[in-house]
Amino acid sequence: RQSKGAYLLKDTLPTDPTGRDRMILDLYGSPDARQINGIGGADPLTSKVAIVNLSDRDDADIDYTFGYVGIADAVVDYEGNCGNISAGAGVFAIMEGFVKAVEPETVVRIFNTNTNKVIEAHVPVRDGKPVIDGDFAIDGVPGTGARITLYFLEPGGSKTGKLLPTGNVQDTITLADGRTIQVSLVDAANPAVFVKATDLGYEGTELPAFTETDGGVLLNTLEYIRTTAAVMMGLAPSKEAASPAVPKVCMVSAPQTYLASDGRTIEGNSIDIVARTKALAVMHKAYAVTGGICTATAALITGTVANEVVSERAKETSRVTLAHPSGKFDFEICLTNDTGWHVEKAGVARTARPIMKGIAYVKGE
């Protein structure tokens, strides 16, 4: 629950993509920086949508499409997936009767149309309904909930078709000021570009509020790297044409002790890598799940910039504890290198709960 979004049945939306997106934008109150005339929360983490329908695939129960709903811009971006919203899709499928509830745990097979990948959501069930309450805590999310384990199956090459889109573990990017930096381009669950914080002159433990006082330098630098990487990965013909959501850009650093956004001390010996990422035009207050899977995967691929800063413990166990502005979370990566790097699956735990079910009114209705 580091995200919030509406789950819409595909057959209730216009079949025409333009009409569909217009309806979703109206529903969220976009374009408007405050989304005052809709259900959007004026934050990238709350301006998300899921479109769901029964799947006709043998390996999936539901088809699920994720969209980033523009806030100030009249656009719905479908280029990538969201792990948090994926967890909610499993709960939604059981609530809607798309999947028969099986106690004590129901496995919902989700085909994500954004990445053409299957995700297994292991949802706890009691009395025929998803269990919502529990003692599993996620840093950055108030309270606790029932643990939902997500397994992203064969997540490599989600958008580019390759785990290493350029075939290299490191590439070089020349920044606008002429500096050259080493980056790693990896595509697992979502494509991302990784850069060391120290190579940009940062500690790596900076909190989102830092960008309010630096004149936009960090955000602009990361966006330059991100859009340059989009072209290098074949995701866009030019920097200007790059999706605002994909690829992710991630700034990584070695394990170190720091203060989280809520003032808690995150001990360096309890984590394996420190990372910061963007959420559209601002710094992420926590960390994207799909971006975390890609980060954990990159950290275990020998020779990447993330691998150069991750703990030796993570390399030995294939379990990566990633530290972000709000705290930390854990990933389990099943990675092989028999005839080249290959990710069999990636596991992460989330929570999800329904807030309401009802009717929303859009223009013309």
Question: For each of these PLM feature ranges, what is it?
Answer:
Residues 2-365:
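A glycine-rich beta-to-alpha transition motif near the start of alpha/beta enzyme domains, typified by
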